[in-house]
Amino acid sequence: MTADYGHVTVFLRQAVENLAVKTNGIYVDATLGGGGHTDLLLKKALHGHVYSFDQDENAIDFNKKRFSKEISEGRLSLIHSNFQNLIKELNLLKVFAIDGIVFDLGVSSPQFDDEKRGFSYRSDARLDMRMDQSQSLDAYQIVNTWEYKDLASIINRYGEEKFASSIARKIIKRREVQPIITTEELVETIKEALPDKILHKKGHPAKKTFQAIRIAVNDELNVLQEALKQASQLLNSGGRISVITFQSLEDRIVKHFFNQLATKNQLPSKLPVPDKFIQEEFKLLTKHPLIPSVEEIEENHRAHSAKLRVLEKN
């Protein structure tokens, strides 16, 4: 069954416009989802080709129907794969360089809203959280088999949760009696580990822990670093990378990676080399990230934490 992909894409226009799309260019949508960015890329690259990746089979199935015309015309290729396989998958299709790529990170609304996927702390389902449902590691395994130190480590590192140790201890204690099978059972366990003052604060008390487990299940941060590296290697001169993030861990990785590339070839200021001879390979097009307008946040509450960063290859 395909999920309902009728959701609002954050930074839809800005993410694609910042790629400065050429009509005959080669572009990649690294996170197909509901096809919002792919649709806009197709409208702008009328004589080019778009390659769209998603590891979620539901997204591929949905978009095969949505873009059946563009696929049959040979303007769009849908690739059922994780974006850490960019170079491998594109090379198989005889594509060795691209003019731009857009990443829309995090869980897509349909994944989050589909209760059976086990992503949400607001509905009850079996613990899962796999973006690629063919992989074996899921949230149930992490919660019920990982050692205390590993649980505490990911909750602290990926969830930035200061009560990580207490939550990990409570998980271990509860699963010794019986397995923690559902999202609701995990939420109850997390709440039991937190002090009352935290439970009465704004925001869901399980949000940080669920984020941490989801990141661990999908190895999101390592995958992101690898994908950014590959994307930068694929770019033609003048090609751009446009990345939308929704949480600080991802944004830090993107910011650091972009800054690293943009300053890579800068020489120490004391060296007597004229500026005209110093040529950076990449340049930042967003010294500060773009953030959503009030209207976008009102239209889509998940947009409030979104940031857009753009890098260009010289």
UniProtKB/Swiss-Prot annotation:
Catalytic activity: cytidine(1402) in 16S rRNA + S-adenosyl-L-methionine = N(4)-methylcytidine(1402) in 16S rRNA + S-adenosyl-L-homocysteine + H(+)
Compartments where found: Cytoplasm
GO molecular function, one term: rRNA (cytosine-N4-)-methyltransferase activity
Keywords: Cytoplasm, Methyltransferase, rRNA processing, S-adenosyl-L-methionine, Transferase
Keyword 4Fe-4S: no
InterPro entries registered for this protein in UniProt: RsmH, SAM-dep_MeTrfase_MraW_recog, SAM-dependent_MTases_sf
Physiological role: Specifically methylates the N4 position of cytidine in position 1402 (C1402) of 16S rRNA.
Protein name per UniProt: Ribosomal RNA small subunit methyltransferase H
Source organism (scientific name): Oenococcus oeni (strain ATCC BAA-331 / PSU-1)
Gene designation: rsmH
